[in-house]
Amino acid sequence: MTNIPKSHPLVKIVNESFIDLPAPSNISAWWNFGSLLGICLILQILTGLFLAMHYTSDTTTAFSSVTHICRDVNYGWIIRYMHANGASMFFICLFMHVGRGMYYGSYTFLETWNIGILLLFTVMATAFMGYVLPWGQMSFWGATVITNLLSAIPYIGTDLVEWIWGGFSVDKATLTRFFAFHFILPFIISALAVVHLLFLHETGSNNPSGLTSDSDKIPFHPYYMIKDILGILLLILMLLLLVLFSPDLLGDPDNYTPANPLNTPPHIKPEWYFLFAYAILRSIPNKLGGVLALILSILILAIIPLLHTSKQRSMMFRPFSQCLFWLLVADLLILTWIGGQPVEYPFITIGQLASILYFSILLILMPISSIIENHFLKW
């Protein structure tokens, strides 16, 4: 009798990826976030699909269609809030996943890391376009402000912005194309995630010690399957707590006002998960400089492997680097807070200092601390 999991072309791929996959025996709960991101993506695609059945991407009816989903569609309110808060859970898992990769030196898997950065950019683009769709005040003004940043590009900037808008302002054409892209991008993300896993399985998983674990591997199923299911249950519990008890906690009240091009909200700000980058953008007085800093705040992840000066892979046994890592986390929290504050003293100064610290830690302090640690170990 043939062994189907090991002989059937399709089942074999699933078997080698999720069942018989050799995994290090010591990976901690920080390795759960990959599977949680997969669950978040599936959840977002499913809830998004049901929302798309009732949503209309027209400036005159978009806001009303979202209201209709919440009021008239069976369980429409829960689908809508699962989708909106699911995005927040997605980004929480993303930040944890990237942070884990930085802490334990997983960025030495260059292909996996670079596809991960591409995934991060794609998810951010998708989330931004999704935020525009309800066509509330913050949707409209957020879209206007963020797309307008492209006008800082010399020579072609203005033409590029008008090309993206499909006219001379954010209007029906913009909303329609944003809906089209918001619908298609999650499937592109799914394809990229498969490639991400493909490259990861070429090298095998990293582990907290950063040492090779070839001599100590265990099968993914049942050990990590059960561990992942526990993580998934906790994720769903947290999401349901958010959706059922405080669905608007992470949203903006301005988005419950229909979009009005004649009335600007007092503080234009994106969703909470973009606030750190928004704070870096605002901390530079020059428009082009701000846009470059905004892009670099994420793109800097691609430079991290080049700045790895330590002779150890993981930060597990590197106390100086650990202190700097947690300082970076605190700095990102400060930037997130500043991004939601008005542009006035003392927030401007705090934002500028936090932005300088962010780039200093990653570009200067981390490599120097690694060299010092090497010296202490007499390597």
Swiss-Prot record:
Binding positions for heme b b562 per the UniProt entry: H83, H182
Subcellular localization, as worded in the UniProt entry: Mitochondrion inner membrane
Entry's Gene Ontology BP terms: mitochondrial electron transport, ubiquinol to cytochrome c
SUPFAM superfamilies in alphabetical order: a domain/subunit of cytochrome bc1 complex (Ubiquinol-cytochrome c reductase), Transmembrane di-heme cytochromes
GO MF annotations in UniProt: metal ion binding; ubiquinol-cytochrome-c reductase activity
Necessary cofactors: heme b
Transmembrane regions listed in the UniProt entry: 33-53, 77-98, 113-133, 178-198, 226-246, 288-308, 320-340, 347-367
Assembly and binders: The cytochrome bc1 complex contains 11 subunits: 3 respiratory subunits (MT-CYB, CYC1 and UQCRFS1), 2 core proteins (UQCRC1 and UQCRC2) and 6 low-molecular weight proteins (UQCRH/QCR6, UQCRB/QCR7, UQCRQ/QCR8, UQCR10/QCR9, UQCR11/QCR10 and a cleavage product of UQCRFS1). This cytochrome bc1 complex then forms a dimer.
Role according to the record: Component of the ubiquinol-cytochrome c reductase complex (complex III or cytochrome b-c1 complex) that is part of the mitochondrial respiratory chain. The b-c1 complex mediates electron transfer from ubiquinol to cytochrome c. Contributes to the generation of a proton gradient across the mitochondrial membrane that is then used for ATP synthesis.
Name under which the protein is recorded: Cytochrome b
Source organism of this protein record: Arctogalidia trivirgata
Record gene name: MT-CYB
